[in-house]
């Protein structure tokens, strides 16, 4: 290698290393910030993933009556649940599918639970959104997905017309119970069997 080549190589490597050093210096604060937020997110993911894994083991060993639930695929945060219409209710004989989505903040924030099967119910709208206090303001980290599913089953047995999501169905429930029950059975037969 000639002296000129050697100088050019040294000069380019020193300018390259000074450019890298300048880039490192300007990027250092950003890396620290992202490490802090990544660390916080990792802890949340770790906490929520551990909790969800434990609940999956529990619900697999001891599922609530007439219910099942578990991950849709490899994503522990996306579950599918099945609820059988409670015996003696207008939903008896129906098989209802629900989606359960956990956030990284779980169990400190409630899971999002929605019906995928259409249902005629004053506390469940046409998008499958459920009006249930424990899925909103009355959520507690002490609650589990098994308890949530039991509460939903209870809602299928005894709706809450005092806090409706679908006002017309709640009014019908209170003023013309026979017609309400007929419609609920009809929808169950049409959409859930």
Swiss-Prot record:
It holds the Pfam family UQ_con. The keyword Ribosomal protein does not apply. This is Ubiquitin-conjugating enzyme E2 E1. Residues 36-45 have a biased composition (Polar residues). The gene is UBE2E1. There is a cross-link at residue 136 (Glycyl lysine isopeptide (Lys-Gly) (interchain with G-Cter in ISG15)). The lineage of its organism: Eukaryota, Metazoa, Chordata, Craniata, Vertebrata. The modification N-acetylserine is found at residue 2. The keyword ATP-binding applies. CDD domains: UBCc_UBE2E. Interacts with RNF14. Residues 22-35 have a biased composition (Basic and acidic residues).
